[in-house]
Amino acid sequence: MADYILTIVEQVGLMFAELARLKSGEKPAGISVLCLRETGLPLDVVKHSSPETILQLLKTGGGTQYARAVLLAELLMQDADLSDAAGKKREAIIGRAQAAALLEHSIDQLSPEEQAIYRPKLEALTSDLERISR
């Protein structure tokens, strides 16, 4: 189990390192490439699907469903940050809502170590979304 935990954390770290190396104009395409490579789902499909549909698509990965959901949530958060920077507030809100739904669905299946990382992220997303909806 510890190897599995390390793998998720390492994958997220590698994704962030890969995104950091890209110039700002290349990041949206980089996120799309990472999304397809790491989760098997095209980012455009994800962005235009409900969280329930995304979770159904992730179930096809069997035992990797929760890890892929966490990776996808991370990518959606990165994409939401880019959308904010580009003035696309609606897209950013939708991306964060999708990320929150994926984390909410997966959080109890994660190890205590992973939960320690992702519960604060989920709480921050939820808080931001509640603030926006007021």
What residue ranges belong to the model's regions?
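Residue-level signature for tetratricopeptide repeat
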Residues: E18-L22, L75, L82-A85, K89, ...
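Glycine-rich, aromatic-bearing surface loops/beta-hairpins
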Residues: E104, Q109-R134
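N-terminal alpha-helical interaction modules that lie
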Residues: M1-A69, E104-H105, D128-R134
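Start-of-helix signal in alpha-solenoid helical-repeat scaffolds, especially tetratricopeptide repeats
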Residues: I5-E10, Y66-E74, I93, A97, ...
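Specific register positions within alpha-helical solenoid repeats of the TPR/Sel1-like families, i.e.
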Residues: S24, M77, D84, L103-E104, ...
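Residues in the short coil linking paired helices within alpha-helical repeat scaffolds
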Residues: S24-P28, K88, G95
